[in-house]
Curated annotation (Swiss-Prot):
Consists of a soluble N-terminal domain and C-terminal probable beta-barrel in the outer membrane with 14 predicted beta-strands. One of its GO terms (cellular component) is cell outer membrane. The chain crosses the membrane at residues 194-204, 223-243, 248-257, 271-281, 285-295, 315-325, 329-339, 353-363, 368-377, 390-399, 404-414, 432-441, 448-458, 471-481. This is Surface lipoprotein assembly modifier 2. Residues 1-24 form the signal peptide. It comes from Haemophilus influenzae (strain ATCC 51907 / DSM 11121 / KW20 / Rd). Residues 193-481 are annotated as: C-terminal probable beta barrel. Residues 24-192 are annotated as: N-terminal domain.
Length: 481
């Protein structure tokens, strides 16, 4: 298909005038519910390419009827390729039946045409499936990404559509087209729908309690032994926005996550956070402030039981800001303050401060980089449990050929405790984490995409009991809808 793609604009320079075809029209679904703020725009091929436009003399233009075209496969192909790129529904519907009759067909072009046809017929689910199949084969085609984003938008898959439009925005230079994308993003932000995100990963941890090397001793003190466990990790996030006038909104959110080990239930845990507040948003900026309440249940660890019990409560407030500095740079910042109260371990009662900032760079729609810094201060009644931690995070994501995608993240944290513990050591830890995740963009099960991850953690410390390293491989699946 790549050779055919490279020939696209060369072929499209050969004039072809078809009966009842309007080349510049942007196709929209029959049941189009797009708000009036988004107008039908002429998105010419030059919107997606730096190829120079050429004026085509009238003497090079020929006019053929549909029956005459059926005898000219090369002309049909020359018309179909730019029709696909220009999102021209009428031309695709005219040429696709003719193209299907020819003995030699390009499967990529055929699937693309079917995606446009399915969208026009109102079968958005099938259209999206076709687009995802194409994306798995080549994620670099910007017209393809735009059409996928459109289909997701009209199918009310809001978060997925937003991701595609934001990626597309990084590679578009045409101001008119950027304005269209911003209108889509603004409309997505104003939709007052529930947003759901679910996740599941299979756990296989051979060092649940982060134990040091077996037999580690400090004087007469002996470190705890490793415990292992297999199970599942789960998460659920739900959010709803209610738009107000002048870009303001109110928001309700719920976040829940936990771990269930079927062969070591003493380490089962679950956390739930509920919050709501106010915010302000445009196509490129979103700021929100909301109080929250959090509850945690825990079975107790090595000294616990097989039943989870209420472990701790938190009450706090969080400020979040996301700002597109340019079409390729984004900064995300969060500030959080909370009060912690424990049911049994009262010496851990106190408050905490958390500040996080992440800078994203998206040089193109198939790649992103980020660098982030976090500061966390935990104040507890027992000062040997109080600490402050500084973290540096780095990451790189890439969509490769043949449908493969990858994500690599690295973090380094420096944690220093305020006072000496019972053994007489003021703990100072350096914590390293590396995670590599791989998945195939065209592999889905009931709408869920499986991802394979390898995770390595290492802790070095002046306290021998807190030196350990471990690695694990696990499968995770998730979906946003």
């Amino acid at each position: 298909m790549k050779n055919g793609v490279k020939q696209l604009f060369l072929l499209s320079l050969i004039g072809l005038s078809l009966t009842n075809v309007a080349w510049a029209e942007v196709a929209r679904p029959k049941n189009d519910t797009l708000t009036n703020t988004i107008q039908s725009a002429e998105l010419k091929t030059s919107s997606f390419s730096s190829m120079p436009k050429k004026e085509i003399p009238n003497r090079h233009i020929i006019s053929l009827s549909k029956s005459q075209l059926a005898h000219h496969p090369r002309l049909v192909l020359r018309g179909l390729i730019p029709a696909l790129y220009q999102n021209n529904t009428q031309a695709v519907q005219l040429l696709l039946p003719l193209y299907k009759q020819f003995p030699q067909q390009d499967n990529f072009l055929l699937t693309w045409a079917k995606a446009i046809e399915a969208r026009e017929q109102g079968d958005l689910t099938q259209s999206i499936a076709y687009y995802r199949e194409l994306f798995a084969r080549d994620a670099s085609l910007l017209p393809l990404r735009y059409q996928l984003a459109q289909a997701l938008f009209f199918n009310y898959e809001n978060e997925a559509a937003k991701i595609q439009f934001e990626k597309l925005r990084t590679e578009v230079d045409d101001e008119k087209f950027l304005g269209v994308i911003d209108q889509y993003l603004l409309t997505l932000n104003q939709r007052n729908q529930w947003i759901w995100q679910v996740g599941l990963n299979f756990l296989n941890d051979d060092n649940l309690n982060n134990a040091p090397k077996s037999g580690t001793k400090i004087g007469s003190w002996t470190a705890w032994e490793k415990e292992s466990g297999q199970g599942v990790g789960y998460s659920l996030s739900v959010e709803k926005k209610w738009p107000w006038a002048d870009h303001f909104f109110s928001k309700t959110m719920f976040n829940g996550n936990g771990k269930y080990y079927w062969d070591n239930k003493k380490y089962n845990e679950a956390t739930v956070r509920i919050g709501g507040g106010l915010g302000y948003q445009t196509a490129s900026v979103e700021v929100s402030l909301f109080p929250f309440q959090e509850k945690r249940w825990y079975a107790g660890g090595s000294s616990g039981t097989n039943t989870m019990k209420q472990y701790a409560d938190k009450l706090g407030i969080r400020l979040e800001n996301v700002d597109w500095l340019s079409k390729t740079w984004q900064i995300s910042t969060a500030l959080e303050y909370g009060e912690s109260r424990y049911k049994i371990r009262k010496h851990l009662d106190g408050n905490y401060y958390f500040v996080s900032s992440t800078l994203f760079y998206l040089p193109k729609s198939t790649q992103f980089w980020f660098v982030g810094m976090d500061f966390h201060r935990e104040n507890t009644q027992a000062l040997d449990n109080a600490y402050q931690q500084k973290t540096l995070r780095l990451g790189w994501g890439q969509d490769w050929f043949y449908g493969i995608s990858s994500r690599l993240t690295f973090s380094y944290a420096n944690r220093v405790y305020r006072e000496k513990d019972l053994i007489g050591i003021q703990q100072k830890n350096r914590e390293y984490t590396t995670t590599i995740t791989l998945w195939h963009r065209n592999i889905h099960f009931m709408g869920l995409t499986p991802k394979l991850s390898w995770d390595y953690q290492k802790s070095t410390s002046n306290h021998a009991f807190y030196r350990y390293d471990k690695n694990r491989i696990y499968l995770e699946i998730g979906k946003i809808f």
